[in-house]
């Protein structure tokens, strides 16, 4: 088996684009319905009240209000608190 493939070949050339994951709206920030709160792989954060989860585990606001981070049963959850509360 040759370990050198020959002229005009390279084993380099792979540098994938960043996935731009992470928290997009932080605690206390006001969001509208449909705004993305967190882009994630897997459920690092779980959806709470007023928050939906997309097919790629993205969390988004279902109702307008302020973002609130908390825990429930040892899991990190994100809730939307209505402006009047």
Swiss-Prot record:
Keyword Calcium among UniProt keywords: no
UniProt GO molecular function: structural constituent of ribosome
InterPro entries: Ribosomal_bL27, Ribosomal_bL27_CS
UniProt KW keywords: Ribonucleoprotein, Ribosomal protein
Gene Ontology, cellular component aspect: cytosolic large ribosomal subunit
Polar residues bias spans: 7-19
One of the GO biological process terms: translation
NCBIfam families per record: L27 (TIGR00062)
A Pfam family per the record: Ribosomal_L27
Family under the similarity heading: Belongs to the bacterial ribosomal protein bL27 family.
Protein species of origin: Kineococcus radiotolerans (strain ATCC BAA-149 / DSM 14245 / SRS30216)
Protein name as it appears in the record: Large ribosomal subunit protein bL27
Keyword Metal-binding listed: no
Stretches for region Disordered: 1-20
């Amino acid at each position: 088996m040759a370990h050198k493939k020959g002229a005009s070949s390279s084993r380099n050339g792979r540098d994938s684009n960043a996935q731009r994951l992470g928290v997009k709206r932080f605690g206390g920030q006001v969001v509208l319905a449909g705004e993305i709160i967190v882009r994630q792989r897997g459920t690092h954060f779980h959806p709470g009240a007023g928050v939906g989860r997309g097919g790629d585990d993205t969390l988004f606001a279902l109702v307008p209000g302020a973002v609130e981070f908390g825990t429930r049963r040892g899991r990190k959850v994100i809730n939307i608190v209505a402006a009047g509360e």
